[in-house]
From Swiss-Prot:
Source superkingdom: Bacteria
Name of the protein this chain belongs to: Phosphoenolpyruvate carboxykinase (ATP)
Residues reported in the UniProt entry to bind substrate: R58, Y195, K201, R321
Reactions that this protein is recorded to catalyse: oxaloacetate + ATP = phosphoenolpyruvate + ADP + CO2
Higher taxonomy: Bacteria, Bacillati, Bacillota, Bacilli, Bacillales
Family: Belongs to the phosphoenolpyruvate carboxykinase (ATP) family.
GO MF annotations, alphabetized: ATP binding; metal ion binding; phosphoenolpyruvate carboxykinase (ATP) activity
Class of the enzyme per the UniProt entry, highest EC level: lyase
């Protein structure tokens, strides 16, 4: 990738040259350090369980991008991309490096982000905690040897000091916690939080800037490939079935969360998976369960005195996680890349019960739904939610997008055209009524519909437009009841369906206003009932 290599500051150089900065330790060496430092506990599965302390998830209100003249006009500033000035950043950066210099040991990893060498980012990760260093080794791409690692000249450096607490009045932060990205200094500075996912998502945010600036698409999606080389992408927010549907026995996993799309095809940005572990069972999700073995990091799970993990126990958080290298999964492609996609699936869990279980999208509709990033919050999942609420996350990944969302949508539209990609909207939510009245669409039906779409079986199918959303719905599909294909037929009262559909359309349109007049054409040609 055409990114200048990081110009090492004297303080960074000094840190890296210290004998106590332990470079490229093996998994076993890190296990010993984790246990000696009381950073985690060994489980009977062979995995290490670590606590992230006070913060069991990301801290989006504490994430900043340094405002620097060379790129400040490119950033989509706002609540997600908060500005911090360069002098404030450099002062805090210096304090963190001084703090780390006093530590008995540091842990250093060199690796890569991006499995396609044409667009690969070279990384150095400096960690205060040994388990964070193993997390980094699991989530990023490991060099083949220590010798290769020692020759890496990083394009970006992560400096992670979770036990360093910022003073907001002095350091210009909002709290003791900070995640600061500087594109000029090629650095992600993290402090005040032990949540390891900040490193993973920090690099994803960096790639979401660097790749599109070179007209390469970056995507928050999972991807798999069939025996004939046919590639499918799955976009979807939490609870839509992205992990479940992309883990198909007859297809190989490219990656489960972050991908790029360049002139060569699809490539995984990561070298590992960061799977949700709450309520995990071997019966329901064998692929993930079996990946939890020696080398895996578990976060915030409950472990008894015998080392047995209770995946159903949410005493610490609902956001329990398992971080493991992708080679812990059997059914994968290595290196994690493949050809251009044939099919894109947008997953949504519509708790209003009005979207069809599957619909084929035009390019404009695809761009509209990509920008919208819709799913539903359900009653009981968040405090105070008693009725279904729409949830919109731009491009299915709003917290990680430094650029104007229209940039990502334009790139997607160009690639859909160029590679003649079929795009489908798949509703894994409700039918026959909203949540509490209707019923969840059967996973059996959803799997079948997705399988048919991916295998190209719907290319020559007969479609009809639904009256409210203007979406193209298959008139029939073997093994799927006709009554659910067109959602109005699944409701006992069609007038109630129309009223509920109108309500959801209004919410979509209200949300879409934030994208401004430059997307007026997408709204007119890709919006509803067009």
């Amino acid at each position: 990738m055409s990114v200048d290599t990081y110009g090492e500051t004297p303080k960074i150089k000094k840190l890296l040259e210290k004998e106590s900065s332990l470079f490229q330790l093996s998994t076993t060496q890190l296990y010993y350090k984790i246990m000696d430092n009381n950073e985690g506990e060994l489980t009977e599965l062979g995995a290490i369980n670590a606590s992230t302390g006070k913060y069991t998830g990301r801290s989006p209100k504490d994430k900043f991008i340094v405002t620097e003249p060379s790129y400040k006009d490119n950033i989509h500033w706002g609540d997600i991309n908060q500005p911090i000035d360069e002098e404030t950043f450099l002062n805090l950066y210096s304090k963190v490096l001084d703090y780390l210099d006093k530590k008995d040991e540091l842990y250093v990893f060199n690796g890569y982000a991006g499995s396609d060498k044409d667009t690969q980012l070279k990384l150095t990760v400096i960690n205060e905690l040994a388990w964070h260093n193993l997390f980094a080794q699991n989530m990023f791409i490991r060099p083949d040897s220590k010798e290769e690692a020692s020759n890496i000249k990083p394009n970006f450096t992560i400096v992670s000091a979770p036990h360093f607490k910022a003073d907001p009045e002095v350091d210009g932060t909002k709290s003791e916690t900070f995640v600061i990205i500087s594109f000029k200094h090629k650095t992600i500075l993290i402090g005040g939080t032990e949540y390891a996912g900040e490193m993973k998502k920090g690099i994803f945010s960096v790639m979401n800037y660097l790749l599109p600036m070179q007209d390469i698409m970056s995507m928050h999606c999972s991807a798999n490939v069939g025996d004939k080389g046919d590639v499918a992408l799955f976009f979807g927010l939490s609870g839509t079935g992205k992990t479940t549907l992309s883990a198909a026995p007859d297809r190989k996993l490219i990656g489960d969360d972050e991908h790029g799309w360049n002139k060569n095809g699809i490539f995984n940005i990561e070298g590992g998976c960061y799977a949700k572990a709450i309520n995990l069972s071997k019966e329901k999700e064998p692929q993930i369960y079996n990946a939890i073995q020696y080398g895996t990091i578990l976060e915030n799970t409950v472990v008894n005195e015998r080392g047995v993990v209770d995946f159903d126990d949410n005493s610490y958080t609902e956001n329990t996680r398992a971080a493991y290298p992708i080679h812990h999964i059997d059914n994968i492609v290595l290196p994690s890349k493949a050809a251009h996609p044939n099919t894109i699936i947008f997953l949504t869990a519509d708790a209003f019960g009005v979207l069809p279980p599957i619909a084929k999208l035009t390019k404009s509709q695809a761009m509209y739904h990509f920008l919208s990033g819709f799913t539903s919050k359900l009653a009981g999942t968040e405090r105070g939610v008693t009725e279904p609420e729409p949830s919109f996350s731009t491009c299915f990944g709003a917290p990680f997008l430094p650029l104007n969302p229209n940039k990502y949508a334009d790139l997607l539209g160009e690639l859909i055209d160029k590679h003649d990609v079929d795009v489908y909207l798949v509703n894994t939510g409700w039918t026959g009524g909203k949540y509490g009245v209707g019923r969840r669409i059967s996973l059996h039906y959803t799997r079948y519909m997705v399988d048919q779409a991916i295998k190209g079986k719907l290319k020559n199918a007969e479609f009809t437009k639904d009256e409210k959303f203007g979406l193209s719905i298959p008139t029939e599909m073997e093994d799927v009841p006709k009554t659910i294909l067109n959602p109005i037929n699944a409701w006992s009262d069609s007038d109630k369906y129309r009223a509920q559909a109108d309500d959801l359309i209004q919410r979509f349109e209200e949300n879409f206003k934030k994208f401004g007049p430059e997307v007026e054409e997408i709204a007119n040609t890709g919006g509803f009932n067009k």
